[in-house]
Amino acid sequence: MPKNKILIYLLSTTLVLPTLVSPTAYADTPQKDTTAKTTSHDSKKSNDDETSKDTTSKDIDKADKNNTSNQDNNDKKFKTIDDSTSDSNNIIDFIYKNLPQTNINQLLTKNKYDDNYSLTTLIQNLFNLNSDISDYEQPRNGEKSTNDSNKNSDNSIKNDTDTQSSKQDKADNQKAPKSNNTKPSTSNKQPNSPKPTQPNQSNSQPASDDKANQKSSSKDNQSMSDSALDSILDQYSEDAKKTQKDYASQSKKDKNEKSNTKNPQLPTQDELKHKSKPAQSFNNDVNQKDTRATSLFETDPSISNNDDSGQFNVVDSKDTRQFVKSIAKDAHRIGQDNDIYASVMIAQAILESDSGRSALAKSPNHNLFGIKGAFEGNSVPFNTLEADGNQLYSINAGFRKYPSTKESLKDYSDLIKNGIDGNRTIYKPTWKSEADSYKDATSHLSKTYATDPNYAKKLNSIIKHYQLTQFDDERMPDLDKYERSIKDYDDSSDEFKPFREVSDSMPYPHGQCTWYVYNRMKQFGTSISGDLGDAHNWNNRAQYRDYQVSHTPKRHAAVVFEAGQFGADQHYGHVAFVEKVNSDGSIVISESNVKGLGIISHRTINAAAAEELSYITGK
C-alpha cells in the first residue's frame, strides 16, 4: 500500500472516520465472499494485460481531470469515482482518490521540532492548522472582528493561490502527451513550487498590520469597558449617583454660605479699617473703663542661660480660683445638658474676662466670654486687642451686654450649640460627642473664636493649671476641696519670681509693657509713677519727677527702649523690667506683649546694647 494511503488509513481508523461512517468489516462476514472477489480480481489481471494497461491509462487521465475539477470547484470533489481502481465499500480508496494531491503533500510536511512525522503534525496539516494554536482559541469580543478580518484575508489570498495553481496545472496537462507516465508526478510537484513563496507574501501583510490591529483592539476593549461601566452605573447605581449629586450640591452650598458668612467673633472689614497700634497709656481717647482686659501667661526662664525655657505657664492667682468657684456649678450643669466641655467653658471665661476682673465682665455688662454683637438689643463698645500672628493691633468693637453672669453662661452655650447666622454648625467640632478631648475642642476654637495664634495653647494651660477637667465628669466635684496654695517666693532669692498683678487701680492699659512694669516693680517693693505716658517718654518724664535715671544697668529697675531701638515699636518705644545683671555686663529682662497677646517672656541683652539703654530706679 502506498505511503499516502497508510497515513490516511491511520487517521481514518484511529481518529476521525470511525465516528463518522459505519464499520467496513464484521466478525460474521463470510470469508469466502472476500476470497472469491480476490480470486476474480487476480484472474482478471492475469488474463488481460493490455486491458489493464488501457484501463490504467484511462484511470490516470480521469484522476488528472478529477484533480483539476476538484481545485476549480470543491463542491464536485466526491462526484467522479473510477470503478476499476476503487471499490465503493473501501473508504480508504474513496478518501485517497478524492483528496487533492496538494493536501497529500501537506500531510508529508516534517515536524520542525522533531524532524520527523508525528500524529500531531498530520492532524495539523490535514486541517490546515498552519498557525499558532492560540489563534483557534475562543476570541474576546474586542478581538473577534480583528481575527475574522485577518482570517478572511488569509482565505482570500489562499483561494487566489489555489486558483492560479489550478490554471497552471490545466495548461500543463494540455501541453503534455497523455502517454507520459511521469505526468502524475509532475502534477503533484507543480502546485508545490510556488507555495513556499506565495504564503510568505500573503502573511507579510498581516504581520505588518499587527500593531495597528492591536491598537484598534485595545481601543475597542477600552470603549467596551467604558460602555459596560456606564451601563452598570446606570442600572445599579442611580442611588449612588443621586447621593453624590446631592453631596456635591450641599458642599457647594455650604462653601458659598461660609464664604458669605461673617463671623461676629472675628474683626470685620470695617473694624480693620480703623485699627491702630495698641496704646501704652490712657491718653487722649483711650480710657481705662473702655479697655478690655484678658488673662496673662508667662514663659519660665532658664536659670542656667538666662533665656526662655520654652515652657508656657499660667500666672497663678487666688482671684482666679475664687472666680472658678463662683461659676463652676452653672458651668457643670450647662455642660452636661448641652454636650459641651465645662472645662473649656470655664477656661474661656478666665481668659476672656481676666477672671472676672475686666470692665467688660463686671456689672453692668457681665460679659464673661468676650462675645461680640448684641444680646436682646443691648451692646457696649470696648477697645480690644487683636492679633495678626504676633503683631498686635487695637480695634473698637461692640460687645454683648447681659443682665447677669448666668445669662452670659447660657448665651455662650447657645452660641456653641447653634452657631452663627449662615453657619449653624461652626462650633459643632467642639461638642463632647464630636471632639475626642478638650484639646480637640480648643484647637477648633483657635480658628473660629479668636485671632490669637496662641489661643488653644493658653486654654490648655489654664485647664491643666487649675485642674478644670474634673468639671467635665458627670458628678459635680466638691468645691470645698477645690483649693491650691500659691507659692511664696523670697524676694532676695536669685530665682525668678512668677508674675502677679498686685494693684487693683491700674493707670496703664492691661497687658501692655507699661502695665507690666508698673505691676512688676510693685511686686518687688518699689513703685513708679502712673502718669509717665508711652514707653519712649518714661526716661525723660521720670527724670523730671526726680527719679534716678542712668545708663548703668541695675537689678529690678525699669529699662527704657527709645522708638525703634533694638526692635522696639517705631511709634511708642518699649519698656521692660531688669531681672538680673550678669557679670559680663549683659542683662536678663522680662517683658509683656513681645511674644504675643498677654504673654510675659524673657530675653538676654548683650553688654554693648545694655549700655545704650536708659534705666529708672523706683522709689
Curated annotation (Swiss-Prot):
InterPro entries: CHAP_dom, Glycosyl_Hydrolase_73, MGlyc_endo_b_GlcNAc-like_dom, Papain-like_cys_pep_sf. Induction: More protein is secreted in a secA2 mutant, while less protein is secreted in a secG or double secG/secY2 mutant (at protein level). Its main location: secreted. Disulfide bonds: none annotated. Residues 327-468 are annotated as: N-acetylmuramoyl-L-alanine amidase. Keywords: Hydrolase, Secreted, Signal. Pfam families: CHAP (PF05257), Glucosaminidase (PF01832). Residues 25-83, 134-226, 238-290 are annotated as: Disordered. Residues 176-192 have a biased composition (Polar residues). Residues 488-617 form the Peptidase C51 domain. Residues 1-27 form the signal peptide. Residues 30-65, 73-82, 137-146, 157-175, 238-260 have a biased composition (Basic and acidic residues). It is found in: Secreted. Residues 147-156, 214-226 have a biased composition (Low complexity). GO terms for molecular function: amidase activity. In the N-terminal section; belongs to the N-acetylmuramoyl-L-alanine amidase 2 family. This is N-acetylmuramoyl-L-alanine amidase domain-containing protein SAOUHSC_02979. It comes from Staphylococcus aureus (strain NCTC 8325 / PS 47).
